[in-house]
Amino acid sequence: MTVSNKDGSEKAKIKVATYNYYFALTYNNLRTRQQQYSRYGLDPKQYNLDVDFDKKLSKQTTKNNDNETVTWEEYIHDEVIESIESTYTYYLAAKAANNGKDPEITADQKKELKETLQQYRESAHKYGYTLSGYLVKAMGKGVTESLFTQEATRSYIADNYKSELSDKSNEKEYTTKDYDNYKKNHEDELLSVDVRLFECSSEDDAKAFKKALAKDASNFTALCQKYASDKFYKTAYEDAGYSTEYGVTKENLKNKGYAIATADDKDKKSFPGLDWLYSSKRKAGDSYQYSTTVVYVLSPASIQNRKTVNVRHILIAPETSDNKTAAKDATDKQWSAAYKKATKILDEFNAGDKKEKSFAQLAKNNTSDTGSKDNGGLYENVVPGQMVNSFSAWSFDSSRKAGDTAIVKSDYGYHIMYFVGNGDLTTWQYAAKKALSSGDSTSKTEKLEKDYSIKVNWFGSRYFEKDVDIDN
């Protein structure tokens, strides 16, 4: 088996042991997925996972991606070949870009690989094997410690190079002409609205909400509290931000699952609720009830020139009795304790120099948001619809200025907010840049993948580890 580019300048011979390594990974991943789905009460058959691992793979059939009937042995074999071709395509390209030498993997990747091997080493010792002996027993002939290390390292190199190509596309600067051309061709996708919006528990409630709604929507917040589904939301909706959506596109509303953004029952390509909301006939003050959604228009559909925002936050989640309890299901006492902690942290910040750097340090020390902890709670180029409503409504308030702080509540806890400032691009330009860079990245990867291919040697394939229980 060989992976190479068209002119043969970059190629790698794939040994049987490498095939066995990938077969074991694919086999075990499939088995793990099946177990996970079953654990959550999902029928494996509905997800093409109805393989019986106690029987020969060659005696069971399934459907492949082309809806053809194949044996499970053939199905997994095809998956393995695709994985090898993809990994070695990017590995070889990375090596070529590094003057023919293997690029270094990151320190974290080296650590992860070392820890993985140590886990296998402990299992090997437990059953009286050397590490290589255990790996061969578990993954197939030839999968020794050195082979495992080699293939894992090459996989890291491939992933890193793929990320590098994507990063280069993301860093590309586009011209005003590029943005305007994108805008011209994607106007409908870029249209956004500012609205008050509430999702009722039933259509009858939505009709009653709409009927009681004042013409100026002055009672919108009160009605949200009245029709909220439980005690938590009745309190949460005291904040108008909970029911405010600034600069949301059709896609934003679809992703959030609002009833107004669902397709027509008979025509799945038609979205009556969105057609009404994004119509050129809409004006500020219009209100509408569609299914269980009630919406009040603050600003009608347009391609807004609102800038992206950069914000920091410190999430203080209620401390529940166990990790399985969602924050919104915490007790009043636990929520109260979280608010006191948030207030104390904000007071500490206000008593200091009130500099962004100080806020960032407090975030590192206190936030429950693991996604932003290491960079001091920072989120850059935030766009409407990206964050929860209350977070987003505060961040995109037109009165917001650098250095502003506040505490806002969400389903996840209390967010101590710090407004850093606006980004360089408008929200529609940022959306255009992401789409353009994604297109450029896709073009690069497609070109690269077309240049490389895999050839399987029939004779060598007779020695692949297939149709066996690799765990025994």
Task: Report residues per predicted region.
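Solvent-exposed, polar/charged alpha-helical surfaces in well-ordered, non-transmembrane soluble domains
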Residues: 17, 21-24, 74, 78-82, ...
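Peptidyl-prolyl cis-trans isomerase
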Residues: 208-266, 340-389, 420-421
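Ser/Thr-centric signal marking residues that sit
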Residues: 26, 367, 410
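N-terminal targeting/tethering segments
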Residues: 1-147
